Amino acid sequence: MPVRKKPRNDQNGRDPWHHERALYGAGYARVAGVDEAGRGPLAGPVVAAAVILPPYRRFSAIRDSKLVPAAERETLYRQIRKHALAIGIAACPARVIDRVNILEATRLAMARAVARLKPPPDAVLVDGWRLPALQVDQWPIVDGDRDSVSIAAASLVAKVIRDAIMRRLERLYPGYGFANHKGYGTREHLACIARLGVTPAHRCSFEPVRQALQGKLDLAPEVSGEEN
C-alpha cells in the first residue's frame, strides 16, 4: 500500500485540500469547486467556472485569482486545463443581469457551469452561498476561493475566461478600455461612458450606468476597482 505524503499547507498553515479530503473520505467520488468572476463590473458578463481536480494531486500554486498576477493566472489556467478531470464554464451577459439581477444571474451561471461538468460531480464546494438549482450535495464556503483548492481553481478559470471576453468586447466597442479595466467602475471607464455613451455590454440596472442613461453621471467617485 503506497504511503500518502503529508498534505502541503498554504502560507496560512491550512491544508488547501481539507474540504475535498473530508468529502473523499466520506465516500464521494468526484468533488467539484465552483466560483464566479465579474459580479461587480458595470459592463460585461458574470462568468462562472466549475472544476473537478484529480484527488490529492499537488497544485501548490493554485490560489484565489484575486491574489495571482495576470501573467501567472494564464500559466495556472493552462495547468488546470491540462490536469483537471472536468471543467464547466457558463456566463450570463448584461441583458440577463438586468432582467433577473446580479445575484440571480450569478447563481444561474454557477449552476450551469456545474451542469456542464462531464463526468458530473457528486459533491460541490460553492464559494459563498447555496445554489438552489443544484441537484447534488453541496457545501457553501465563505471565502471559499481562499480555503479550497477546487474553488480557487474555479476562480482562476472564471477570471481568465472573463478577461478574454472583455478583450473581445474591447474590439467590438473600441475606445471604452474594456481590456484594461475589465468593465469595472474606474474613473477611466466612467469618463468613457460619459464621452461615448452606453453600449449593449453595459449593465443598465447598475446605478452609474442608469445615471448615464439619465444624463446624470457623476464622474467624481470610482465605483469599483479590480486587479489587472
What are these regions (language model features)?
Residues 1-228:
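RNase H-like, Mg2+-dependent phosphodiesterase core
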